[in-house]
């Protein structure tokens, strides 16, 4: 689950992570009133959407007067902002964050993530702040420093100081930076986050260390422990298909391809998408049906996939362990009939009751193309979509 920058900064502020003062506004008039509450002569007017790259896309403005705050607010509110993370359709700006300006000395990047290789939380930092960390990793990976954190001990003060020295935080600000990082780690752990990222973190002319950005992703599996976090969810910022999928215990992420995928298991889903790409196709989604799919669940999965107008074919790749292939086959047949599917459909089944499942598909009389392996299925759906 994602939240807006201003919500992230409210969490930071409440847990001892230093941020500039700021207020959220929903109209140009409110933006001016909120700016008046700030003790500043310079204001930063920030578009609030669930996507990065806002600055480069024109979604962050520096205002040197209240009249400029009003001008920028009118310019941004209602505008569709297109960044490298929104896709070409962009996102409409419905709220702004009005923040105090500060005398930036230097910008940095810091982030806490879960490293799947070590199964531990990792602190990453770089003195190349203000730019995409992926770009830094690709061009100058030597400028990224990491600290792997022992889950029993947590982030140690010496690790925080070492990172601060490595990214060339001014000596007079190292202790403040270390304290900042320790507080930020506490946010990550206490709120069950999957990512906490600040880009940029800045040092100021006064020697302060501040978060000028706040990106927080929460582990959906832990949200039951954080009702206060759930209340921050902005459904208008989320894909309606993803919201619908979550209602049926389906994991769905929209992509920009044209081949819909329904798979059970996240690992198999990713392997399926990679295989489709290998044979020249483009997946339209990640959809994990989980290990307990029912006929109804399969039908809903088809409806969600077909809710994407770009989909030109569907590949179902199921390994029946807990999930029985005959149940999946019955669900596929029922779904195809209910949604009146006219697009190419390739189904690969393997595992428990696989022969019975294949017989159900064959006897249905529907235009369902079988596949014996994942590779064969991927090749078939790519070919059918290209010929359609």
Swiss-Prot record:
Protein's UniProt keywords contain Membrane: no
Keyword set, alphabetical order: ATP-binding, Ligase, Magnesium, Metal-binding, Nucleotide-binding, Tricarboxylic acid cycle
Pathway: Carbohydrate metabolism; tricarboxylic acid cycle; succinate from succinyl-CoA (ligase route): step 1/1
Binding site residues for Mg(2+): 199, 213
Pfam families assigned: ATP-grasp_2, Ligase_CoA
Enzyme kind, highest EC tier: ligase
Record-listed E.C. numbers: 6.2.1.5
Residue ranges occupied by any ATP-grasp domain in the UniProt entry: 9-244
Cofactor entry: Mg(2+)
Function of the molecule: Succinyl-CoA synthetase functions in the citric acid cycle (TCA), coupling the hydrolysis of succinyl-CoA to the synthesis of either ATP or GTP and thus represents the only step of substrate-level phosphorylation in the TCA. The beta subunit provides nucleotide specificity of the enzyme and binds the substrate succinate, while the binding sites for coenzyme A and phosphate are found in the alpha subunit.
Family statement: Belongs to the succinate/malate CoA ligase beta subunit family.
Assembly and oligomerization: Heterotetramer of two alpha and two beta subunits.
Record-given protein name: Succinate--CoA ligase [ADP-forming] subunit beta
Source organism of this protein record: Staphylococcus aureus (strain NCTC 8325 / PS 47)
Lineage, highest ranks first: Bacteria, Bacillati, Bacillota, Bacilli, Bacillales
């Amino acid at each position: 689950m994602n939240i807006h920058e201003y919500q992230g900064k409210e969490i930071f502020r409440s847990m001892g992570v230093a941020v500039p003062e700021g207020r959220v506004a929903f109209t140009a008039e409110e933006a001016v009133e909120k700016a008046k509450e700030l003790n500043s002569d310079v204001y930063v007017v920030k578009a609030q959407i669930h996507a990065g790259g806002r600055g480069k896309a024109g979604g962050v403005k520096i205002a040197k007067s209240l009249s400029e705050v009003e001008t920028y607010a009118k310019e941004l509110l209602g505008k569709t902002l297109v960044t490298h993370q929104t896709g070409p359709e962009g996102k409409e700006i419905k709220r702004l964050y009005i923040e105090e300006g500060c005398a930036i000395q230097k910008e940095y990047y810091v982030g806490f993530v879960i490293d799947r290789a070590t199964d531990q939380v990792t602190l990453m930092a770089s003195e190349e702040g203000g730019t995409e960390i992926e770009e830094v990793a690709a061009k100058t990976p030597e400028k990224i420093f990491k600290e792997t954190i022992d889950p029993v001990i947590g982030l140690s003060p010496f690790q925080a100081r070492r990172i601060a020295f490595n990214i060339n935080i001014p000596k007079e600000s190292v202790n403040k930076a270390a304290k900042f990082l320790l507080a930020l780690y506490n946010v990550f752990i206490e709120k069950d986050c999957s990512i906490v990222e600040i880009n940029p973190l800045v040092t100021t002319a006064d020697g302060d260390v501040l978060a000028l950005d706040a990106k927080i992703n929460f582990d959906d599996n832990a949200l039951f422990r954080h009702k206060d976090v759930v209340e921050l969810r902005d459904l208008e910022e989320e894909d309606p298909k993803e919201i619908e999928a979550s209602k049926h215990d389906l994991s769905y992420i929209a992509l920009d391809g044209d081949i819909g995928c329904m798979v059970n298991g996240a690992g198999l889903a990713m392997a399926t998408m990679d295989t489709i790409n290998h044979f020249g196709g483009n997946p339209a989604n990640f959809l994990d049906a989980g290990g307990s799919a029912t006929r109804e669940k399969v039908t809903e999965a088809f409806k969600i996939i077909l809710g994407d107008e770009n989909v030109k074919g569907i590949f179902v790749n199921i390994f029946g362990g807990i999930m029985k292939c005959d149940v999946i086959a019955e669900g596929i047949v029922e779904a195809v009939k209910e949604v009146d599917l006219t697009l190419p459909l390739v189904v690969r089944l393997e595992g428990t009751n696989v022969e019975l499942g294949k017989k159900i598909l064959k006897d249905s009389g529907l235009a369902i193309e079988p596949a014996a392996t994942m590779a064969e299925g991927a090749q078939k759906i790519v070919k059918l979509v290209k010929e359609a």
